[in-house]
Amino acid sequence: MAKKSKIERNKQRVALVKRYAAKREALLSTANDESLPMEDRFEARLKLAELPRNANPTRIRNRCAMTGRPRAYYRKLGISRVALRDLGSRGMIPGLVKSSW
């Protein structure tokens, strides 16, 4: 089980990303638009730099929904390999069978 502080910090980052998503998208489109003058583009870059650091989506860490484990995360299921193995062995995931050959 991951530390609760790490899990909560990641939840706060997710909330910040959602809050600033529209503003960030607008500033990025302005900054990358080559038809605009260089001064406007530079000003958009400065405003983008003023946004909170944790408002950047790359700062979010994928974590297991059950344990909070940050590694071996399966995106399709939203859980880690440890939780997948545990749920699979208990028959809680439909269609998942132990392989044998």
Swiss-Prot record:
Function comment: Binds 16S rRNA, required for the assembly of 30S particles and may also be responsible for determining the conformation of the 16S rRNA at the A site.
Stated name of the protein? Small ribosomal subunit protein uS14
Give the gene symbol: rpsN
Which superkingdom heads the taxonomic lineage of this protein's source? Bacteria
SUPFAM superfamilies for the chain:
Glucocorticoid receptor-like (DNA-binding domain) (SSF57716)
Molecular function terms in GO for this entry? Answer: rRNA binding; structural constituent of ribosome
Per the UniProt entry, what are the Gene Ontology biological process annotations, in alphabetical order?
A: translation
Q: How does it assemble?
A: Part of the 30S ribosomal subunit. Contacts proteins S3 and S10.
Gene3D superfamilies with a match to the protein in the record: 1.10.287.1480
Q: Which organism is it from?
A: Methylobacterium sp. (strain 4-46)
Q: Which GO terms describe its cellular component?
A: cytoplasm; small ribosomal subunit
